[in-house]
Amino acid sequence: MTTQESADIFGNNKSILITNVNDGTGPVDIFIDAEETISDIGCEIRKRHRGEAEFIVDGAGALALPGLSNTHTHAAMSLLRGYADDMILQDWLAQKIWPLEAHLTADDVYWGTRLACLEMIRTGTTAFNDMYFFMESAAKAVDEAGIRALLCYGFIDLGDAEKRERECRATEALVAHIRGLKNSRIHAAAGPHAPYTVSPEGLKWCGEFSREQDIPVHIHLSETEKEVNDCVARHKKRPAALLDECGLLSPRTIAAHGCWLDDAECALLGKRGVSVSHNPASNMKLATHRALPYRELVAAGANVCLGTDGCASNNNLDLFEEMKIAALLQKFFWNDPTVLAAPEALGMATANGAKALGFGDGALVAGAPADLILVTTRTPANTPLHNAASNLVYACSGSAVETTICNGRVLMFDREIPGEEKVLAEAAGAAARLVRRAQTPS
């Protein structure tokens, strides 16, 4: 492909034929039509599509994967990357993060989300689940970046009835706004922050609203031992039981963390069909002292997927790195090298994540949304290629992603992303201004 052709491949959807790419089982061709879907995939299909493809991409030396799904993050917190590290979780939140967030503006969230989308595109993520503030600005950023997102307003009432009313109205407004966009890549969710920041009344409202609107629920659950103990002391029940009582556990629910779930809670989440987002890097960095009970959740029937959390506590959005950390943490903590094998970790970041977010099946099959990435095998870390899943999980990083396609649109080709320098400059400026505002006496 010539330089001129490379420039032309960006922008509106094009019909693209990817030839001789390895899908993990062997070389195949993939034809993406101009209608945003994978219309054909298989050996030697180039013969019947070569004449209709606007662009032909030589996939030799690359692995094709479904686009990855990040099922828990706070995208705009990319502006807080490196701002506060090596602290106890509650101190980190109360002393550094929440005071800084009090100075956030809609413009900050826009540029922080653009920066996060840029990083995700670079590392092969085509869909993410986001909870934060000024989410109309986040939606604008996602729309312009070209990837998929499930967005919710972080509902926090702290037991205050007046604040709860404001949070309800903010949630309703965001859902109406996103539906008004009529963008198939951007969906809305209800976002009760956590059982320790939202009253039972607020939790019940979110549960009822999600049922009425048929939208997902995104919530933090049992991240630390302290929040579990506090919940038992305050409500005489563990967090998962409280959420169930409030009508918040269903197949629409994505619960992040889950480090301190017990066996009964794992069984309950499985029974309710909940998706649980494992965020191992953030959990280890903030020392939550326990790993997600992965085996118990899977055995119970829960859909276990993968998330990075925000850049303030990770500090990146690279799901390749997260797959490796997840697999290693499970093996180390549970003292069993067979737990969370490489194909399972890959499934968490692809099929399981797509299922949780409601964006297709996370598979490379005819008729599927054209969300896929090409990962180079021509690197030391991917040589030799005895086992594709093993290399992808244990050996390579997101820097091996060369091409990212979402909804049939090429967002990155040969590591080039149009407009990258402007996003980097604007995001850096927004971060600097945010910190200055927070440090200026009122």
UniProtKB/Swiss-Prot annotation:
Keyword Metal-binding listed: yes
Cofactor binding notes: Binds 1 zinc ion per subunit.
InterPro entries: Amidohydro-rel, Deaminase_MtaD/DadD, Metal-dep_hydrolase_composite, Metal_Hydrolase, MTA/SAH_deaminase
A Pfam family the protein falls into: Amidohydro_1
Pathway of action: Amino-acid biosynthesis; S-adenosyl-L-methionine biosynthesis
Record's keyword terms, sorted: Hydrolase, Metal-binding, Zinc
Positions contributing to substrate binding: E101, H193, E223, D309
EC code(s) of this entry: 3.5.4.41, 3.5.4.31, 3.5.4.4, 3.5.4.28
Record-level Gene Ontology MF annotations: 5'-deoxyadenosine deaminase activity; 5'-methylthioadenosine deaminase activity; adenosine deaminase activity; metal ion binding; S-adenosylhomocysteine deaminase activity
Reactions performed catalytically: 5'-deoxyadenosine + H2O + H(+) = 5'-deoxyinosine + NH4(+); S-adenosyl-L-homocysteine + H2O + H(+) = S-inosyl-L-homocysteine + NH4(+); S-methyl-5'-thioadenosine + H2O + H(+) = S-methyl-5'-thioinosine + NH4(+); adenosine + H2O + H(+) = inosine + NH4(+)
Biological process (GO), any one: S-adenosylmethionine biosynthetic process
Signal peptide location: none
Keyword Plastid: no
Binding site for Zn(2+): H72, H74, H220, D309
Cofactor requirements of the protein: Zn(2+)
Family note: Belongs to the metallo-dependent hydrolases superfamily. MTA/SAH deaminase family.
Known role: Catalyzes the deamination of three SAM-derived enzymatic products, namely 5'-deoxyadenosine, S-adenosyl-L-homocysteine, and 5'-methylthioadenosine, to produce the inosine analogs. Can also deaminate adenosine. The preferred substrate for this enzyme is 5'-deoxyadenosine, but all these substrates are efficiently deaminated. Likely functions in a S-adenosyl-L-methionine (SAM) recycling pathway from S-adenosyl-L-homocysteine (SAH) produced from SAM-dependent methylation reactions.
Other comments on record: SAH is a product of SAM methyltransferases and is known to be a feedback inhibitor of these enzymes. As a result of this inhibition, organisms have evolved efficient enzymes to metabolize SAH via different pathways. The pathway found in methanogens differs from the canonical pathway, it uses the deamination of S-adenosyl-L-homocysteine to form S-inosyl-L-homocysteine for the regeneration of SAM from S-adenosyl-L-homocysteine. 5'-deoxyadenosine is a radical SAM enzyme reaction product which strongly inhibits radical SAM enzymes.
Quaternary structure annotation from Swiss-Prot or TrEMBL: Homotetramer.
Name of the protein this chain belongs to: 5'-deoxyadenosine deaminase
Taxonomy of the source species: Archaea, Methanobacteriati, Methanobacteriota, Stenosarchaea group, Methanomicrobia
Gene (UniProt): dadD
